[in-house]
């Protein structure tokens, strides 16, 4: 076995551990945050402040029987949860947490992650189709149409950032934002490049990240009041657990991408923390924002969801891309 393959496998195991811990304790954080917003206590029974609740829930999921309903396509039914989790693990392998902390740096890291993101729709479609359940199938169709609709403006916005930074390598993108928070791609008047449209790019990318992770108010694929539990209605035990971990892993990936593309990555404007800690602070602030939005805004309708993308975000992102290219041509040094 080659050294490169060993390194990739080790990186995948580290990514799996990182995803598992984050998925477990982001559930705890979300439950505590929801309780605070709704003036409840949240989980408090297992350990201080309920901190042992995630491992207890994990043990419960792993010890439950995996029930395969009659009439399902067994092969696709078993493959779908793995396919939902695998792209998230591979994405973490290419994400740099600082200039020196990256499992496997790639010159095309942004393209790789955006390519892996497209697998999410396939996993959802396989889960709905193989379940032979009308609610699961309807939820899968909703979720896939949502994924396709919001991948387009996300990709266009990512191209806008590539134009500004001149690279698809995450480390180069972060380097183009170094020198203080006023150099981040978030700001409209970045020194040396008068790009007044970057706040629009950030807003579009953030909205698309919410929609791509099926988070409220865009959780139409799991609308409990309409579709039981959505595309994973028939799943139990670790089949459900893999979908659950994949969802929270995608939340972390969305926060990482937003931080790398718009918030300077591990660049620290004050020099108070090492780069990796500053990077983690940024992504967890974004994750808290995801949680806050979920428990603040009501679920939209499927028509409103698709109209927002096809009629507003896609045209706006295209106009933004063209104007950004024009400004770079005119004003770039």
Swiss-Prot record:
Keywords: Cell inner membrane, Cell membrane, Membrane, NAD, Quinone, Translocase, Transmembrane, Transmembrane helix, Ubiquinone. InterPro entries: NADH_UbQ_OxRdtase_su1/FPO (IPR001694), NADH_UbQ_OxRdtase_su1_CS (IPR018086). GO terms for cellular component: plasma membrane. Its EC number is 7.1.1.-. GO terms for biological process: aerobic respiration. It is a multi-pass membrane protein. The chain crosses the membrane at residues 8-28, 75-95, 108-128, 154-174, 191-211, 251-271, 273-293, 312-332. Belongs to the complex I subunit 1 family. NDH-1 is composed of 14 different subunits. Subunits NuoA, H, J, K, L, M, N constitute the membrane sector of the complex. NDH-1 shuttles electrons from NADH, via FMN and iron-sulfur (Fe-S) centers, to quinones in the respiratory chain. The immediate electron acceptor for the enzyme in this species is believed to be ubiquinone. Couples the redox reaction to proton translocation (for every two electrons transferred, four hydrogen ions are translocated across the cytoplasmic membrane), and thus conserves the redox energy in a proton gradient. This subunit may bind ubiquinone. This is NADH-quinone oxidoreductase subunit H. The lineage of its organism: Bacteria, Pseudomonadati, Thermodesulfobacteriota, Desulfobulbia, Desulfobulbales. The gene is nuoH.
